[in-house]
């Protein structure tokens, strides 16, 4: 693995953490949304990551012995919560049913805030790794001068 592929790994990590943060911010913004264009309350979303595989001719020949070469991380899918919404008794609410109950998203904003902090820290870790690789490349170029 060369230094430039390390930059690619860090860049993919930054991109994945950015996507995770965007989904978490969407969850927080819609924590009290009772009506969506699809009907019903907002459904919480989660990001699922997967390893990117680096396929090279050498790796394809010796993949059995060496194992797959990981080239970063990617967003495999964004899953939507399938649990039943939380029902609250608010009889005067415009979205209340005949019994006076309103369906709200089943989510915990504090949990999403903690996850958002984790995404931010993951992004920062990838930036630090990218800066370290950049420094290594610059030092290697200095040696050649």
Predicted regions and their residues:
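Amphipathic alpha-helical polymerization modules
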Residues: 1-145
């Amino acid at each position: 693995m060369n230094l430039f592929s390390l930059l690619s790994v860090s860049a993919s990590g930054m991109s994945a953490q950015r996507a995770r943060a965007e989904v978490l911010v969407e969850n927080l913004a819609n924590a009290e949304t009772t009506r969506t264009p699809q009907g019903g309350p907002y459904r919480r979303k989660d990001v699922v990551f997967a390893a990117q595989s680096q396929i090279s001719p050498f790796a394809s020949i010796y993949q059995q012995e060496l194992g797959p070469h990981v080239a970063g991380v990617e967003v495999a899918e964004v899953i939507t919560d399938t649990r039943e919404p939380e029902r609250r008794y608010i009889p005067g609410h415009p979205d209340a049913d005949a019994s006076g109950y309103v369906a709200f998203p089943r989510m915990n904003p504090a949990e999403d805030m903690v996850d958002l902090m984790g995404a931010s820290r993951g992004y920062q870790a990838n930036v630090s790794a990218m800066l370290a690789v950049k420094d290594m490349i610059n030092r290697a170029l200095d040696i050649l001068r």
